[in-house]
Amino acid sequence: MNVDVVARLRSTFRTGRTRCLEWRRDQLNALEAMLLNHREHWQIALGQDLGKSPFEATMTEIYPVITELKHTRRNLKKWHKDQPVRTPLQFFPGRSWVRYDPLGVVVIISPWNYPLQLQLSPLIGALAAGNCVIIKPSEISSAVEQLFAELAPHYFDPEAVAVVTGPADAATALIDARPDHVFFTGSTRTGTAVAERAARQLVPVTLELGGKSPTYVHHDVDLKATARRITWGKFINAGQTCVAPDHIYAHQDVAAALAEEIANAVRESFGARPEKSEDFGRMIHTGAVDRVGAMIPPVGSDNVICGGQVDREDRYVAPTVLYPVAESDPAMSEEIFGPVLPILPVSGPQDAAQRMLTRDTPLALYIFATDTSVRNYIMAEVPSGGVSIGIPVAHVGSPHLPFGGKGASGQGKYHGKWSRDTFTHQRAVLSKPLKPETMGVIYPPIHGAVKSVLDRALSPVGDKKRRAPGS
């Protein structure tokens, strides 16, 4: 069946109808209508899957998509028109340009943690580029999956946009059907499997993965403001965010005070009993509760500054701050992807950078420092997919910035015009008229004068004699 859907959409693509800017704009308008007309239904579904409040569902899932959509729609014509470039002198008279051609049939495999935003944001780019698209929502966030599958045929062109539901095997079958591109968001382990599967078919992939995104806090910052911002970025969606601050390296002079300030910020945000707060979500399933709960020392342990409670039946893990933490502790063994925040004291930015470099390249890097030289040092020393200074997560929400990983945290970029680049083939075109004929000098037989001109063109500037390195 999945082979059939790829073939069916490819037939649609070959008619050329998706290349029309009007069609692309119509699909973007349809996406906007589907979101806004059913805003309450999306809020309910997100509440069922992840315990999100209506406000959090709107702020983290609906609003970012609408922002991205409006930005893309506003720039649609400009981004996708031919781009003239310079033509080398030897090809004059002539013209050169870059065409942004749609790829064809694109498969988007989306995750469960932001099940609406992370399937619709890439969909915006794929549709704007003129592709036919197959969306495979995560079966784990089943309420959103079912709602999307129900609504999509009533809004999108059904011959160009398809939704495939079901277990992970359905995604595997889609890859085997040889689409023109696969866009995957999820774990590094699954992303590796997707890349390997796609490589067998020579299908290009974009991988948006994750990792342990670190934070460095220097001794010169406002600790209260820093703590409040980190608390927001860490505990939104119960910590199940691919760019959440995974752990903190705090300067030893302020580490203990920072831990207390974050604990205070947790209480200010979610009250004395976060399980009663509508602003604090739930883990996706009991397996996630068990995995994250195993990272937490027993309640009452000296390094549990706040939280530590777990209710498996309610899928609840309390917002938890751990200090001090060692590199060998359970919370540092893998990406946490939950509401547990370890804080490790360090002697300074050099110590923090060296520790960060012992791990895979993260999707995000966060720096809290007033001293510009400290910020620049960390950014220069530590590679990452993206960086936010003075606030976590925020860079992901800008359609004017590329979003993507590096190394183990992913490959490829999207958002804004970077989605255009991901979902199009940048096609080189050079056009030269047959008259006047200016190419005769390079046609065989080659005359000595032409060879002399070429030799002079390749002569080193300012030194007519070539010298071997070191001579």
Model-derived features: positions:
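Residue-level signal for inorganic ion chemistry
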Residues: 24, 69, 130, 161, ...
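ALDH superfamily catalytic-core signature
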Residues: 189-326, 350, 389, 451-452, ...
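N-terminal Rossmann-like NAD(P)+-binding subdomain of aldehyde/semialdehyde dehydrogenases
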Residues: 1-97, 470
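Structural signal for hydrophobic packing residues in well-ordered secondary-structure cores
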Residues: 13, 17, 32-35, 39, ...
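Conserved C-terminal structural/oligomerization subdomain of aldehyde/semialdehyde dehydrogenase
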Residues: 19-20, 316-471
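Short, well-ordered beta-strand elements within core beta-sheets of diverse protein domains
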Residues: 11-17, 108, 216-217, 247-250, ...
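Short loop/edge segments at beta-strand edges and connector loops
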Residues: 80, 165, 186, 306-308
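Rossmann-like NAD(P) dinucleotide-binding subdomain of oxidoreductase/dehydrogenase enzymes
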Residues: 88-225, 261, 346, 470-471
